[in-house]
Amino acid sequence: SPWFQGKGPAVPALAESAWIGGWREAGDLTPDSRIIQGKLPNGFRYALLSAPRKGKVSLSLIVGAGSYAERPSERGYAHFTEHLAFTGSTHYPSGTAARFFEENGMKFGRDANAFTSGNRTVFRITLQKADQKTLSESLQVLSDFAGGVLFAPESVASEWGVVLSELALADTEEGRTLADLRKFLYGGTQFEFLPAGDPAVISAASPENLKRFY
């Protein structure tokens, strides 16, 4: 695929439906023989699996970096970057990726979504029609997420509120108990902190620092 053959950083990826089978280069488990796996010259890994859902294609881009890659001054940068990927990129500036999803019958949350964990950031797209044009453009969107996020100042400013709202919603008794438990179990390590981040760090995040982390 030409979308991921550039000279940018290698980004591991695999089909969403292949995730359970797992990507194992070594170990005791035998990979599912139905999964076609490979690696492009730039190090980008891929896996393909024919699924029983006719007329639909599920794509996942799995970036091998999450909140564990953050310094204390970057708490929440991986999660913030995940948000910003949808707001503007090289081929889809100013939120035009959202228009592409809508024009092709996809809805945010259901068909286009993402999440950040400690060791990965995952973008998922489910195509409601499996024609070549839609597939080609969807791969371009994921390629942009991998190496073409723009970090426009206006996008960073608009997403501040969104990310901080998510943090506020999580600031419940249950959420605080979980934070205390993680601190007790993992205090002093990267495992102590949730990917959502630190409100103070998020509020001070600049486009330049976010792009440097990216």
Q: Predicted segment positions?
A:
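Proteolytic maturation boundary segments
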Residues: 1-48, 56
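Scaffold signal of the M16-like zinc-metallopeptidase fold and its non-catalytic homologs
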Residues: 8-19, 87-92, 114, 138-141, ...
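M16/insulysin-pitrilysin zinc metalloprotease superfamily fold
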Residues: 29, 87-91, 125-159
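Solvent-exposed coil/turn segments that connect beta secondary-structure elements
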Residues: 41, 51-53, 62-66, 89-90, ...
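Short, solvent-exposed loop/turn elements at domain surfaces
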Residues: 46-49, 55-58, 68-71, 133
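M16/MPP (pitrilysin/insulinase) zinc-metallopeptidase core fold and M16-derived inactive scaffolds
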Residues: 58-126, 173, 192-196
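Acidic/histidine-enriched alpha-helical segments
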Residues: 94, 98, 102, 150-168, ...
